[in-house]
């Protein structure tokens, strides 16, 4: 009895396992046979109707025994569409038509297709048109030699070269598809889009007819006037002449190049760049890098921030300049008297091997080629330091022709021993240059000087000359060597090195700011202000005249 019970349990277990396997197999088969969610069901049993033919015949011994042979003004109707042609083979069994000569297919009031020959499958609702195919849909026209139109999905495919015309836009490609319902198209291989005078070339392009928007994928190029845009992922609005470019795109306009991770480019309008933006002007040999840039071609106004760096490489030594924000303004644009102003602020730091500078704000005016530094400006050249309330430097091409320090001017030259300093202070200073070399230096108003004299033989210090006057003019020779001095009324005291009073070594406003001096091009990003108590006296300042800009 126990054996019978065990046998029965084994049988029950075996039967249960078989049932589970059968159920699993049934579910698997059902899953494999389940239709796709997005697939549309092809309607069955809707016949193609022959409306008219001048001649109809049937030949069971011909090469088409199952076809009705039709000639003369042949016309068919199927599910709201009409097909006319010169002659046709009508296959009632398969619910299909082969049409020849002046084939014309119409669907509603918005779609019309003409070709030399076609095959229409009523069962699959598929129209295959060949030779001189022209598809008209609303305002769009598609020309090709081979086109398949799927009525169920409302999509037309061409695969032997085609042209889509949408108003002023003309699209050419080797292969493509056009959705009549959504009015969207896709073009692949040797794609070219002409929109007015603009030309787009790419490998893959998605085109939205309703929005006149082209999406370029892969290496692409837009030629617009004198500008060339290169991108691998871009959107181009043919109506507004603007583009959204992603993935390290570039805009080239003659000698100027703009590159960025993301660029919003507007022809004759405002363009914007985000992420690692690089602007290069090859003609003038300068560049600008930042993480956010905005520029309007119509107004000539620009704005750069998020770590902007301006670089000038027009000279033997390259100049790097950094500030929190940079702006550009253009005046009298589109005239012969056009000029620009560039503003950099705050925390301006600049470095060149032979020149360094810091200030709160800076303005460059191309009208008079003047660069003005405001609020605690300091300029260094080799072992010399110059500071004041405002420093103006006038350029001749890329070389200095005139420098003007206004208010609390102080010029210091560090001696070779790094202990003693030649010093001049006055209300203002003027320096005149010839081919970049200083020729004349003039100090005006409350002039005080501390000058250490040296031995001509070994350059050792032999004494100190302290001088006070109203005006002092120095004439320089080659190598910035002083040749002569002119002054009017003055008082002067000469001290031997062993008899110099401690108070005469340095002027009362002496300050040596070597600790805030930029050391190299990477040091321009680290702002170091003057130590407390060393700032210029708190009097009425010369403020940078910033123009307003609409954000």
Can you say where each PLM-predicted feature lies in the sequence?
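N-terminal amphipathic/hydrophobic interface segments
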Residues: 31-551
């Amino acid at each position: 009895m126990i054996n019978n019970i065990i046998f029965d349990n084994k049988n029950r277990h075996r039967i249960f396992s078989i049932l589970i396997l059968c159920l699993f197999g049934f579910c698997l088969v059902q899953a494999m046979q389940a239709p796709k969610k997005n697939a549309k069901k092809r309607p069955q049993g809707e016949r193609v109707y022959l409306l008219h033919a001048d001649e109809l015949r049937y030949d069971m011994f011909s090469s088409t025994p199952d076809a009705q042979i039709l000639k003369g003004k042949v016309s068919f109707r199927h599910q709201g569409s009409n097909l006319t042609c010169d002659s046709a083979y009508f296959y009632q069994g398969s619910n299909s038509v082969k049409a020849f000569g002046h084939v014309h297919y119409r669907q509603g009031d918005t779609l019309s297709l003409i070709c030399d020959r076609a095959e229409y499958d009523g069962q699959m609702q598929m129209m295959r048109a060949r030779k001189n195919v022209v598809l008209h849909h609303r305002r769009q026209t598609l020309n090709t030699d081979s086109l398949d139109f799927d009525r169920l999905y409302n999509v037309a495919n061409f695969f032997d070269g085609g042209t889509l015309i949408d108003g002023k836009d003309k699209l050419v490609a080797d292969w493509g598809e056009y959705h009549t319902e959504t009015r969207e198209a896709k073009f692949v291989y040797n794609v070219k889009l002409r929109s007015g005078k603009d030309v787009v070339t790419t490998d893959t392009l998605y085109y939205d007819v309703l929005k006149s928007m082209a999406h370029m994928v892969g290496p692409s190029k837009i030629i617009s006037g004198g500008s060339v845009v290169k991108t691998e992922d871009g959107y181009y609005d043919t109506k507004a002449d603007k583009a959204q470019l992603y993935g390290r795109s570039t805009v080239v306009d003659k000698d100027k190049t703009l590159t960025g991770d993301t660029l919003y480019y507007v022809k004759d309008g405002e363009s914007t760049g985000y992420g690692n933006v690089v602007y290069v002007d090859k003609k003038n040999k300068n560049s600008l890098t930042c993480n956010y840039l905005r520029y309007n071609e119509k107004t000539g106004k620009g704005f750069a921030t998020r770590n902007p760096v301006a670089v000038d490489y027009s000279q033997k030594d390259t100049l790097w300049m950094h500030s929190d924000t940079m702006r550009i303004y253009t005046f009298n644009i589109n005239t012969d008297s056009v000029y620009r102003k560039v503003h950099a602020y705050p925390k301006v730091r600049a470095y060149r091997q032979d020149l360094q500078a810091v200030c709160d704000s800076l303005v460059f005016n191309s009208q008079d080629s003047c660069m003005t530094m405001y609020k605690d400006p300091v300029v260094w050249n080799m072992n010399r330091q110059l500071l004041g309330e405002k420093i103006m430097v006038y350029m001749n091409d890329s070389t200095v022709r005139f420098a003007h320090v206004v208010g609390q001017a102080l010029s210091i030259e560090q001696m070779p021993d790094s202990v003693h300093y030649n010093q001049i202070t006055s209300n203002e200073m003027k320096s005149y240059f010839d081919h970049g070399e200083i020729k004349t230096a003039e100090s005006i108003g409350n002039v005080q000087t501390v000058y250490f004299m040296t031995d001509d033989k070994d350059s050792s210090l032999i004494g100190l000359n302290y001088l006070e006057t109203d005006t002092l003019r120095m004439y320089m020779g080659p190598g910035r060597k002083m040749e002569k001095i002119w002054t009017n009324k003055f008082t002067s005291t000469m001290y031997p090195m062993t008899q110099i009073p401690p108070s005469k070594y340095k002027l009362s406003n002496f300050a040596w700011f070597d600790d805030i001096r930029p050391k190299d091009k990477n040091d321009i990003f680290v702002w170091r202000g003057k130590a407390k108590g060393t700032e210029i006296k708190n009097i009425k300042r010369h403020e940078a005249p910033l123009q307003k800009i609409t954000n």
